[in-house]
């Protein structure tokens, strides 16, 4: 996992399956409508500034790595409040015209949801973007891309 550390800095969704925790989530996203136009980072990291993006990405990523290495992963992963807030911000960011002009739901923030002043996007759109899958065992035969080599391409070129 450390040899593939560089993959975490980019936006390639295959970096999210360096450990098996995200395999079912990757597989169900890959076969869903969002896979055509979005990456994991489009929904799961903040986009308001680059510092917040990489701080959040590093913190969240280390949490996933820690849980994987210490075998503490849950059967069904749920976003913690901080992650849920980012996900909701990104739903509204990408679907701004639809949310604010057509159905008038985009004015609700995740804090409003926490105060019972509205619903989160996924309260109605439960199957977006990962389908009906809700646990690690619900997609036991999930196929995901595996890297050809754990050695990054730039290092392979230096060694040759």
Predicted stretch roles:
Residues 1-160:
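Short sequence/structural segments immediately N-terminal
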């Amino acid at each position: 996992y450390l040899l593939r550390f560089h993959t975490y800095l980019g936006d390639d969704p295959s970096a999210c399956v360096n450990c098996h925790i995200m395999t079912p989530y990757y597989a169900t996203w890959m076969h869903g409508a969002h896979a055509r136009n979005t990456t994991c980072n489009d929904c799961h990291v903040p986009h308001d500034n680059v510092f917040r993006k990489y701080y959040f990405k590093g913190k969240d990523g280390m949490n996933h790595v820690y849980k994987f290495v210490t075998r503490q992963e849950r059967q069904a992963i749920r976003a913690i409040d901080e992650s849920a807030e980012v996900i909701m911000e990104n739903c509204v960011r990408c679907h701004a015209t639809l949310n604010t002009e057509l159905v008038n739901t985009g004015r609700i923030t995740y804090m409003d949801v926490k105060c019972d002043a509205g619903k989160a996007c996924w309260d109605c759109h439960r199957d977006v973007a990962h389908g009906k899958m809700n646990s690690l065992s619900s997609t036991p035969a999930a196929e995901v891309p595996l890297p050809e080599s754990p050695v990054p391409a730039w290092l392979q070129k230096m060694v040759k």
